[in-house]
Amino acid sequence: MDVLRTPDSRFEHLVGYPFAPHYVDVTAGDTQPLRMHYVDEGPGDGPPIVLLHGEPTWSYLYRTMIPPLSAAGHRVLAPDLIGFGRSDKPTRIEDYTYLRHVEWVTSWFENLDLHDVTLFVQDWGSLIGLRIAAEHGDRIARLVVANGFLPAAQGRTPLPFYVWRAFARYSPVLPAGRLVNFGTVHRVPAGVRAGYDAPFPDKTYQAGARAFPRLVPTSPDDPAVPANRAAWEALGRWDKPFLAIFGYRDPILGQADGPLIKHIPGAAGQPHARIKASHFIQEDSGTELAERMLSWQQAT
């Protein structure tokens, strides 16, 4: 497996991202160890919050949520998935599988020995994080899903998703910053768009971002479907606190909270919300998300 590592110079002077880098080696199956980057802010002995990003972003997406969460006494950790941010980037699309992503993040949890975690997930962070919650529930104390879901090839896949999948596969460029701008209610300033572009000096660094859309299980014969269906069954027994905060302006996932709230026992009686935000809800409403999380945690 050939691997690229984005030069550190690409991450200098980013708008609103003053966090020191941290690294740990992770593994998946028989793959070589890869270096995963993560933010680690707040007191080391504080109650841990883990923030998982998705496509095509990185921990930069959480830059407005990390300060208020850590200031409230939490240890806030935000990893960059393999292929994204400051983490290592295998160069072939075929190097990335759904299972490997789950195993890489699981390895990160294990190496940091994280327990009693409040796990916040969005986009592909939910596809990975909900699997981890179902398979390693002893590590997770609370779940928050924002504009996410757990696909198991049941029901119809929205047409806009297939448009996005085709774009990611065939477009000669994959402009992360512009894509984030397209998926928000508010215009994203140029300096912030540059922050999303920083991990990808050129297209050779983008195999992970190209791979993600095609890894979403949309047919029953997808290799990820059995594990996802087992995870969905396990979530049907999840009685720990579960919160859904969705941006209703998201054209693909804006109403995907309903099945989660109905299925997960721990969702009963929680202050779920749909707010004026689009797919990248952290970019639209990061401060509000942090405030809602903190008040909810105090109550649970």
Curated annotation (Swiss-Prot):
Gene Ontology, cellular component aspect: peptidoglycan-based cell wall; plasma membrane
Enzyme Commission identifier(s): 3.8.1.5
Keywords: Hydrolase
Source domain of life: Bacteria
The reaction(s) this protein catalyses: 1-haloalkane + H2O = a halide anion + a primary alcohol + H(+)
Gene3D superfamilies: alpha/beta hydrolase (3.40.50.1820)
Residue ranges occupied by any AB hydrolase-1 domain in the UniProt entry: 47-176
Broad enzyme group: hydrolase
GO molecular function: haloalkane dehalogenase activity; hydrolase activity
Residues annotated as catalytic: D123, D250, H279
Hydrolase in keyword set: yes
Keyword rRNA processing attributed: no
Purpose: Catalyzes hydrolytic cleavage of carbon-halogen bonds in halogenated aliphatic compounds, leading to the formation of the corresponding primary alcohols, halide ions and protons.
Oligomer and partners: Monomer.
Note: Was identified as a high-confidence drug target.
Family: Belongs to the haloalkane dehalogenase family. Type 1 subfamily.
Name by which UniProt lists this protein: Haloalkane dehalogenase 1
Species in which this protein is naturally found: Mycobacterium tuberculosis (strain ATCC 25618 / H37Rv)
Gene name tied to this protein: dhmA1
